[in-house]
Amino acid sequence: MALIVHLKTVSELRGRADRIAKVTFRGQSFYSRVLENCEDVADFDETFRWPVASSIDRNEVLEIQIFNYSKVFSNKLIGTFRMVLQKVVEENRVEVSDTLIDDNNAIIKTSLSMEVRYQAADGTVGPWDDGDFLGDESLQEEEKDSQETDGLLPGSRPSTRTPGEKSFRSKGKEKTKGGRDGEHKAGRSVFSAMKLGKTRSHKEEPQRQDEPAVLEMEDLDHLAIRLGDGLDPDSVSLASVTALTSNVSNKRSKPDIKMEPSAGRPMDYQVSITVIEARQLVGLNMDPVVCVEVGDDKKYTSMKESTNCPYYNEYFVFDFHVSPDVMFDKIIKISVIHSKNLLRSGTLVGSFKMDVGTVYSQPEHQFHHKWAILSDPDDISAGLKGYVKCDVAVVGKGDNIKTPHKANETDEDDIEGNLLLPEGVPPERQWARFYVKIYRAEGLPRMNTSLMANVKKAFIGENKDLVDPYVQVFFAGQKGKTSVQKSSYEPLWNEQVVFTDLFPPLCKRMKVQIRDSDKVNDVAIGTHFIDLRKISNDGDKGFLPTLGPAWVNMYGSTRNYTLLDEHQDLNEGLGEGVSFRARLMLGLAVEILDTSNPELTSSTEVQVEQATPVSESCTGRMEEFFLFGAFLEASMIDRKNGDKPVTFEVTIGNYGNEVDGTSRPQRPRPRKEPGDEEEVDLIQNSSDDEGDEAGDLASVSSTPPMRPQITDRNYFHLPYLERKPCIYIKSWWPDQRRRLYNANIMDHIADKLEEGLNDVQEMIKTEKSYPERRLRGVLEELSCGCHRFLSLSDKDQGHSSRTRLDRERLKSCMRELESMGQQAKSLRAQVKRHTVRDKLRLCQNFLQKLRFLADEPQHSIPDVFIWMMSNNKRIAYARVPSKDLLFSIVEEELGKDCAKVKTLFLKLPGKRGFGSAGWTVQAKLELYLWLGLSKQRKDFLCGLPCGFEEVKAAQGLGLHSFPPISLVYTKKQTFQLRAHMYQARSLFAADSTGLSDPFARVFFINQSQCTEVLNETLCPTWDQMLVFDNLELYGEAHELRDDPPIIVIEIYDQDSMGKADFMGRTFAKPLVKMADEAYCPPRFPPQLEYYQIYRGNATAGDLLAAFELLQIGPSGKADLPPINGPVDMDRGPIMPVPVGIRPVLSKYRVEVLFWGLRDLKRVNLAQVDRPRVDIECAGKGVQSSLIHNYKKNPNFNTLVKWFEVDLPENELLHPPLNIRVVDCRAFGRYTLVGSHAVSSLRRFIYRPPDRSAANWNTTGEVVVSMEPEVPVKKLETLVKLDATSDAVVKVDVAEDEKERKKKKKKGPSEEAEEEEPDESMLDWWSKYFASIDTMKEQLRQHETSGIDLEEKEEMDSTEGLKGPVKNKEKSRAAKEEKKKKNQNPGPGQGSEAPEKKKAKIDELKVYPKELESEFDNFEDWLHTFNLLRGKTGDDEDGSTEEERIVGRFKGSLCVYKVPLPEDVSREAGYDPTYGMFQGIPSNDPINVLVRIYVVRATDLHPADINGKADPYIAIKLGKTDIRDKENYISKQLNPVFGKSFDIEASFPMESMLTVAVYDWDLVGTDDLIGETKIDLENRFYSKHRATCGIAQTYSIHGYNIWRDPMKPSQILTRLCKEGKVDGPHFGPHGRVKVANRVFTGPSEIEDENGQRKPTDEHVALSALRHWEDIPRVGCRLVPEHVETRPLLNPDKPGIEQGRLELWVDMFPMDMPAPGTPLDISPRKPKKYELRVIVWNTDEVVLEDDDFFTGEKSSDIFVRGWLKGQQEDKQDTDVHYHSLTGEGNFNWRYLFPFDYLAAEEKIVMSKKESMFSWDETEYKIPARLTLQIWDADHFSADDFLGAIELDLNRFPRGAKTAKQCTMEMATGEVDVPLVSIFKQKRVKGWWPLLARNENDEFELTGKVEAELHLLTAEEAEKNPVGLARNEPDPLEKPNRPDTAFVWFLNPLKSIKYLICTRYKWLIIKIVLALLGLLMLALFLYSLPGYMVKKLLGA
């Protein structure tokens, strides 16, 4: 069978261009070759061939599209020709010449000529002549090429029901064939056949699934590839690139319908903010406080005095219990306030704000160590006000966030590279104005009682609208509101609310609310949220936020006014609105401000101004829309509503609302204007005889009242039978359909993509073959969909009512989809079997992006509401988006529910729908809806099931176009439904026993049936077939086959008293068999499938079932397939699931390891004493032995038992295994203690080992060089062994180890250079901090490699796409630049210029999580099953599974097919009594020494009012309870405990260790902050050997001493013995052989005296560290470690209360005793004394003006401190009246301090306030502050300048004052950095800086100082005096004696003034005068001398 198209020519083309044709049939497309430079005629002369597996339907369509081809841009569509293949099917050969149509369905001149041929399989169609085509050489070439195809693509198969063979443009003109004359009794109008988008009949689908697919070529220059008839896709040479586009898994049978509203339900949230420090605060000599606000809650840090860079490190926690929407809109505000105290509120320096949602959307829901930029909201021209470094995290219930490790944190001084901004936000944000323009509103509801209004009307005759509206806008923590419009349902404002904020803003949403002004309390009428991300685009070609002018629809509570509205929350925007409230016309614009403009208002206060009014037509031309609905079924009506008549009302906006839509605006129907383009486009859709005059067509919006009939004890139904009521509503809305059409196209693409991705996931989950092919098909469909969007979306470009957002958004969507299509195409080629999961993740990103783009921010037509009403009260509703119902003649634009029968489940409004009330179905409707323009009305019945007659409201001439008020079905089909209910698993526990008595109730149409009740199980196997006979369904048979009604299955718990409890619900669609179909594979019989059961929004188990709907033909039930039940069972009237559907069974053996029971709680107040465990699976089971005295020994005597059972061969269908624990009481009674259901046996199935695998091989050699000290960048060394490798592992001591040993012996100079630590100085903390450094380095490397990999993938997927990658490249370049800066930081960045070489220190492993998560819960052979009792709690109860746990069963399972492979039972030492559990240890009681090391806690939840806690450790194990109350740590949220505790315990009685952190309180009981529980028994018995961690190196002394009482060689010997492994065999030269693996390593060890001795321990340790490579028994051994465990509080389940770092060692008491515990007590800070001598100052700015002379001078003194101004501030004396800025002091400060070198922090203890009970320890950075001041006698001293020196890294001082420049402090020049802790003594000149009026640094002086650091001991030996005192006094400075007052010593002053100030001037004048005098004397004497000379005298 094949369809062949010969495309000849296309003529009358316009212009000269390259042409290409695309021919599509059944979604499979071929492209022609490109014809270059065609002018008028394109002569294609090409043949295309489709092999078809199923016969062609006469209604199928062939589509030809002609494009102008472009290599660069997307191809431009010239025109389309669509042909219905009716004539081709009848005559086999058709010649066609016809014109094309354009996008708007208008005829164009261009025409094509072609020939179409078809041969059916049975040869029924005409004579066939092969020669015409098959002789064609080109085709044979193509046939040949197709053998080498690298891809196959079946596309989607759109189809139509259009009779007639002409192209679609002739729609309105042509009558259908076959005797239909267009009368309505046939159930279809003439035009009904024109509906596109109705899915093609699936009758042939199974045959077609394997049909060869055709690839749509990426390179259009090539010929399209064709595949020959009957060729199996997998036989193609490159089958790996095959694509599959039809669904493999039967997902369509599982409609996903969630009943309960999820939005609006409150949840627990915790916002934690750590304020670390602030930098570069603007202002002089500040006392800053940081205020942290979240919503309305405020908290403050302590005040730091006289500093511009305060250090706080304070932690704040805010707890909330609100709905997610409210939470994410809360604003986090961080402000810095200067001089705040009890009396003063302080002045704001700057603030920073962002919403909680922005933080939550970050990776791990947090910002870590980021700098917030402060700006002044009162002065937007002021610029930057400083930075605050903080951590911000938002945690919801159940969120697990990974917090980076707190210890040993270095200052990240790269501020610019670590700003508190989301990815993509530029660091320099600009100020912008946000103009929210409010124009007018319509359709407001009544908001006052009419009582007073009626009184007024009676007295005054005044009739007012009962609402006084105004609009309030909330944005970024500010709000503004318009004026109030008194008494108006249609208020007109024309005002704009103006916000000023930084752009882009860090607040995502703007809230616009219409409120009613009231004297007592204003209430919200409706709320709309504007998401700024949806109305802007931040890309290169993006646009600023813009909106409208456009109408937005507001929804909320019902419109009837009551004084106390229970649904008022809905009007506030919380939860889904249940009714239309109003619509508001608004606009939004953003203007970026030029802050340098002097006319700019600098405040950010909200302003309200007048806005320019806009015309009414700006939102689009008003059009009349027509909504039609037909109610085909109303069932499952809740019994509460069953006693009164029920009616259904449909509304759109206020139209159709007859009960409370009183304030509906009466809009006149707009006149048609002759020039309208739309009119021309759609002229074919309207007809002349349409009854369109206003008033001709009244709306009918509700069904006639009808009394429900009973279905069963829970539900009723309405007996519609063959008469189906209809509704229709006329309404007027602006015509903005284009927006909805574009959204629909994207929704269609997204739905198709989601369906495909779900299918791929299902294939992976169920392990179906070739998921990669299906993913390729999904990507191919996505690519085609994106290209289709580009061709369809760009219509109506010149539409006058298009807003700027419409235009920009369309461009943006087109760019995104074009890029997505190309990425999908290139991704398709990369999909391989091993990359499926990675590519699936990338596709999920596509889906998210599509969903985001499809959400249209500018509304047009309001949503449709369907209300069920009883007794004139609204009971329940459903809401359908209008875009889903919108009609279009283009298939892709059609709403997904338009002209389709949709199943709707009505729900209760608002909060009534939460919880158990929301679980009940209020009503189930089968409803047909259609929405379109009135002029398209002829189509409204086109999708209804056929076979009806219309009943009109009125009869008369010309009324045939009126819609019907009901439909009477004359055609009906009779069916039988078979529901094969096999089993369910993981159901909710509905009884107090923790079990249920479940039965299932199946609903179909108006019938329901129940399965039998199975008692006391959560995993019932009903194995029952329910048969529903004589089901009457209305409509055509084939329509029912394609889209059968939904089956509802509800699971209930049978109660002896009262009604059954609801446990969950699921939905299914049956597989339909028509009477003329054979009941045979592949479709029948149906396969059992799992259906997810939901209770509300929570999953409540799975149902394994199958459903089939069988048509009963003319000969009755005789034609139905027989019911073949299993012959071996007789269950009376209950019919089991038939053979063929029920699973195929095999014999399995289930071995059970019974180890013991733990922590059993009392049952009915009585203790459990003699428990027993019952195991049951598929009706078979086994009982454990009885524990005779649970208190004495809770373990079982008999360890292993087994039973045999028949289980399905398909592992996915395995039934659950039930574990029950009963307590055996006297007189044969027993009570259920608790139960556990193992829902999946998969992990317990035994699979024989693969003998060919690598670790079974015993030959080969691998060399591994092991370094005892792991360098920073080296990750864990693993030995990989392949099947042919020799098994020798060489562990060499690395060369640098030997070098290190050598260097130790060298002199001190080399040692200093190498920075080699002195081993005697090292302790456990050195090891800990070194390990954390390594961990951080590894994480950093991991992140960078992760980023690189991600970017590589991005680059791969965007191959050849230059545009989309640009941003990425830019940001990457910036990151690289930053990285370089960080690696070579300047001096200002506070890091040493030469990179510090890491000292070599032995390390341990720091796990940032629990040890259990790293080692699979230590369940390698012993599993823990939680036993549950009691009812499953509901979400709103806040109850968790934890509360239902009544104990734990320890044991294991092993499931395998019998008989067992012989080689297993023949293995050495096989003990049949233990079965598969060979080599397990004895479970007799054992005494153990448990040693707990608690290192530290981080981020504890504050427990006191002051926001701090006083934590201490409490440990409980069995009866031992240790409370370390005396050693509580005062006011600390990050305490370092450094404690170890030894407890002797006895397993199994004492095996659960609880480590808790309590808050110490002086009065009252101590509060629990949080606790963590550790199961020690699983650790103790685990093969991972978690008793004592294996260290990295073996040492017998020093800080890294070996802790385990067993040496490595002893451990190795024991492991070999237990695992029955050959070895260990120690050989010479450090060799050891273990099971054909040889390890080599160092063979000597150095003792405390430096003596070297031979040892085997090093090599034994290397074998232990590679134990996972030992064949058969190898596994990873737990290394020496510290684990980080979350602390949880039972009162706040699911939210971490902090983290605790600890580790646990266990030592059996029958082994050698361990050594003394390690000393991990917190390091004591070392005492130092810093001596600072201030010698001189120079160039100090002169501040004072002299009273008499106006001379500038300063009275200088220098102030310095180390810990804080209040703690140790010291001042020099005053150098008075310095006229030059020079000051001489010779003054010494002494600063004693305690210092922690590892953390680089000064430790100080002080009382927090005068009321504090004890001192609090603070850790602050070691920074010396020097300030220069001008002393004043009467007023306050003036601050002149300061410098802050970080004692660990500060610029070296200049040698002279001249060389000292400002750049030394600002880091602009490269100055060497020094550390006082290394240099000990430093002297030099340093600059002092202050900020000027322009907020820039300026030099205000220089200080010469000398810093000398001594330890406390050295300081004691060499004491010195403070200031200039003894001992070792400093000389008095030689100051100029100008400290005077004029009138005391005038001569001295004159002398100073003249001598000092005018010295050089006076000298010059004197010299000049002397010169003049000499000249005068010379001139005076000259004549006399000359005369004398002349006369010779």
From Swiss-Prot:
Gene Ontology CC annotations of this record: apical part of cell; basal part of cell; basolateral plasma membrane; cell projection; cochlear hair cell ribbon synapse; endoplasmic reticulum; endoplasmic reticulum membrane; Golgi membrane
Record-annotated C2 domain positions: 1-98, 251-372, 415-546, 959-1084, 1131-1257, 1460-1589, 1710-1861
GO molecular function, one term: calcium ion binding
Basic and acidic residues biased stretches: 163-186, 202-211, 1366-1379
TM stretches of this protein: 1960-1980
Free-text cofactor note: Binds Ca(2+). The ions are bound to the C2 1 domain.
Cofactor(s) required, per the database record: Ca(2+)
Signal peptide stretch: none
Binding residue positions for Ca(2+) 4: 1504, 1559, 1561, 1567
Binding annotation for Ca(2+) 1: 991, 997, 1053, 1055
Subunit structure: Interacts with SNAP25; the interaction is direct. Interacts with STX1; the interaction is direct. Interacts with RAB8B.
Protein name as catalogued: Otoferlin
Organism: Rattus norvegicus
Organism lineage: Eukaryota, Metazoa, Chordata, Craniata, Vertebrata
